[in-house]
Each structure stands twice: as structure tokens, then as C-alpha cells.
Amino acid sequence: SLLSLIRKLIT
């Protein structure tokens, strides 16, 4: 999901 992608970028 989008959240997962965003989280990945943040982490």
C-alpha cells in the first residue's frame, strides 16, 4: 500500500 512505500522511504 501507499503507507508501506512511504514508510520505506522514510526508514
UniProtKB/Swiss-Prot annotation:
GO biological process annotation, one example: defense response to fungus
Provenance organism: Oreumenes decoratus
Keyword NAD: no
Tissue: Expressed by the venom gland.
Keyword Membrane annotated: yes
Major location category of this protein: secreted
Name of this protein: Decoralin
One cellular component term from this protein's GO annotations in UniProt: membrane
